[in-house]
């Protein structure tokens, strides 16, 4: 069968549609926001492909995978196993890095373990092994007169029960072993858990070291080396101190030795490789004196946290210790000697004073109250681990070099540079090393190449996955899938072009075509014109959003879509419709926010002027430093300035001009709430007005109902059986939890008495079920309610229900709800708004609405700063600040500044090059 045939798809708002998707082709699903694209691609196609695969597994395996519900569809024929690569699942694990997610780091560990040359970290000498006689000499020299145990580490951190091994030890005639650090008789060792890692050390002998015992000691050492493949451990009986000797690798000058070189020595997720100080995280969290202290104030009032109600009990001990040291507590902190300040901060045993920082750190670990922990958290900063300097690995691992580089040196390079290193290494290696490394290097170079091809050459393999954007994470997964070389699979992707500069879109398209050419069907939900034009087949849903969408509007080749009379996408692609360039642009007023000497991450000590009262676009290729400049520096600095927070600001000398604005607001894509209790009506405050209206009805007044009666969050009006949730969660084993509609209120969230109150024949639950468009017509006589609903319509959200639970909203929808909330406020007109890629998830027609909304914010006298790659938005800006020229190390400079016309003329700007064809020819006069 050469196609996937979907019959009667009704998931969410799909209107019983039939769709045919050609196999082994690049297929784009497009249409307005809310038209049902994700419902078709993810909730129907992927969900059914995954469900059928999972159902074929045993019940034991299914309990770990969960079972997906069968989508609302009559039939799907010709379906392949499905893999979804979406934006939502970014990693929250601080141990995940680009290297571990792509699995490239696993290959590197094996390479360093097999080809790496261990060196001494103290003198740089190549390590060599010790013979049994040399080990004997060291033991006699170091432990003379001391009672020691000679141990042979037979098992080191391996999973298993080891019953057979323990029987074997008995046969050899030994009676004692150390299991996981505990000394036991062999016959008394309890059964070991097979899924836990264990360490078993055989006790060869116990004796007091002396010259007379040399022969016995030599025999012990040789036996220990034989049993453990070259290792012997000496444990001092009295102190418990241990020392490991190796037949293999040791520095003759410093005695520094490495056990055996194995892949786990290079794993920061294993106790054998992780830095013992930070446990492989590369960072430590500690209270920063610079954040905690105000040096201008008198010493007794200088500790900021002491001025809050919770910690004012510390004031007396601080004053007391300063007096004991011979100083007046009213002396300004900065005038106290360094030794006195250190005692106040870190304590003194002789004065019986714990110190402010150790005290707060202890309270943070022991405290039950979330409120107090949050208070202390404001003063905690993340710093590189002082021992490994952020490398995550123990010094033994970092001392193993290939071509003069440690594994950390290489994972810290940008991916593009690392690829060059391995290509050169491949040419250099010879003989046995070449044979060992051949396959490993080919695999590493190929996988790094995939990352370069999806426009991620600026990332390093050591970059923490928690700091990646949704778009970056999705493209990393895409590169990983290419590396897996699967065929016959259905890949479903969600807007992979997000976060990509137009320069890199062609690389992404080639990657998608590469997946297709392996023999896979690639289905992409996408709005980017270039990606749509590269598709083999286009499916357009619409014509509108929500209940006005879910129909199949058009499908076929790109040319067929362009000429289709009903296709909105075709109208934009063919030029019949377009987003107009503004007739005139606002001019800078002379007031600026000036960022001076920014050098966080890859920013090259730059100065940036952001003109106030304008619509400003920050542009540049991925990794050029846009988010660092706007979020790590400007937003955090402004937040501390306006709201007195203690955010860790990126490296910058100063920011001037903040006195020209009143506040800063970040409108990001994070959810408007974590629980189903949050919804668009509660978030935009329109629900307050609706509840007031219901409380004003004659029946509600007669019963004495206040607006609180119509809230599903408090006792009184809500259904108590489900506590206003409308559903009850039932825990299932082998299956995911099931949400059952509440029997009592039938999902309406309120009790019967509350639902008896109606307005124009509808009760409060009916209103929450209305879409924004329906509610707008329903409340025609209430201008205050309509004003808030009108703004939701303006940002393109007329299709969402007022009571739609927050977790079901996409990032783009959440961001536009926040925009609507800001627009509905009575504006002062001196606000700085920051937005990161607000066009995410928007069709070209919705982008037009978004631009109108942003222009309205600026017309009110505000400043809107947008990080954006969408050329339709960029061409409508008043001012552009273009960073680059490249990503990563080769980025971080200001490439071009000015109006879109000025930037388009700049020969050094990639943005300018692509912008030219979007601007009217007549506006590009030189």
From Swiss-Prot:
Domain of life of the source: Bacteria
Molecular function (Gene Ontology), one example: excinuclease ABC activity
The ABC transporter domain, residue ranges: 308-568, 588-916
GO biological process: nucleotide-excision repair; SOS response
Residue runs in coiled coils: none
Keywords on record: ATP-binding, Cytoplasm, DNA damage, DNA excision, DNA repair, DNA-binding, Excision nuclease, Metal-binding, Nucleotide-binding, Repeat, SOS response, Zinc, Zinc-finger
Zn finger (C4-type) start-end: 251-278, 719-745
Database matches in InterPro entries: AAA+_ATPase, ABC_transporter-like_ATP-bd, ABC_transporter-like_CS, ATP_grasp_subdomain_1, P-loop_NTPase, UvrA, UvrA_DNA-bd, UvrA_inter
Gene3D superfamilies attached to this UniProt entry: ABC transporter ATPase domain-like (1.10.8.280), ABC transporter ATPase like domain (1.20.1580.10), ATP-grasp fold, A domain (3.30.1490.20), P-loop containing nucleotide triphosphate hydrolases (3.40.50.300)
Sites where the protein binds ATP 1: 31-38
Residues that hold ATP 2 according to the record: 620-627
Family annotation (Pfam families): UvrA_DNA-bind, UvrA_inter
Main location class: cytoplasm
One term under GO cellular component: excinuclease repair complex
Subcellular location: Cytoplasm
Tagged with keyword Zinc: yes
Chain's role: The UvrABC repair system catalyzes the recognition and processing of DNA lesions. UvrA is an ATPase and a DNA-binding protein. A damage recognition complex composed of 2 UvrA and 2 UvrB subunits scans DNA for abnormalities. When the presence of a lesion has been verified by UvrB, the UvrA molecules dissociate.
NCBIfam families in alphabetical order: PRK00349.1, uvra
Complex formation: Forms a heterotetramer with UvrB during the search for lesions.
Protein family membership: Belongs to the ABC transporter superfamily. UvrA family.
Name this polypeptide is given: UvrABC system protein A
